[in-house]
Amino acid sequence: AEADLLVHDLSPDAADLVGLHEDDLAQRHPSLVTVSVTPFGRSGPYSKWCAEDLQLIHGGGWGWMTPGCSDEIDLPPLKPAGQQAGFQIGFAAATIALGALDRSLCTGEGEHLDLAGMAYISSMLEAGFISWSYLNEIPGRAGTRILNPWRIFEVADGRIFIVCVEDDQWARLKEVMGSPEWAQM
């Protein structure tokens, strides 16, 4: 059997037990790209710890920021709907895996990528780092109030979540709303 890419979510001990340690794989299959997706990475003080979506969301800081789409900043830390940590970490794993695979197919050299889920979730804290760097705005529980629509809005029949970060998205949203005068710049 042959493969160019291996992605797994086994704990470091489980991966070693079934022969998927990155050093052994690199020696046997030098062009293979491997991606380990674990809660805390394959090394470090928490590498053997388990975690689920809820722990990753709150450990990564996202839970504290959850009222960011609401005006009710006194709400307790919340969990986003669904399995958001898993979705986001999976998307990151796919992205880095395909990038490394493309490089490997060009060079013939494999590599191992270690994706720590909590570190990735921490990197997503809204636009906090950007807002602090460029606007000198310190993010708080109310989220980062950036210049584009990115929140839950009250509407006539309930609520709607709108994210328009690109000019063409804003243009289409204005069109859907009937091009109100207040939305013209």
PLM features: what roles do these ranges have?
Residues 1-109, 135:
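N-terminal helix-loop segment corresponding to the beta1-alpha1 unit
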Residues 66-74, 122, 141-146:
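Short hydrophobic/aromatic-rich motifs at helix boundaries and adjacent loops
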Residues 39-41, 54, 117-122, 157-159, ...:
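Glycine-rich beta-alpha junction loops
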Residues 57, 64, 95, 99, ...:
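Generic alpha-helical structural context detector
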Residues 101-140:
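Substrate-binding/catalytic subdomain of NAD(P)-dependent oxidoreductase enzymes
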Residues 148-185:
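Aromatic-enriched alpha-helical interface/lid elements that frame and gate functional surfaces
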Residues 77-88, 110-112, 140-144, 148-150, ...:
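A short glycine-threonine-serine/GTX helix/turn-capping micro-motif
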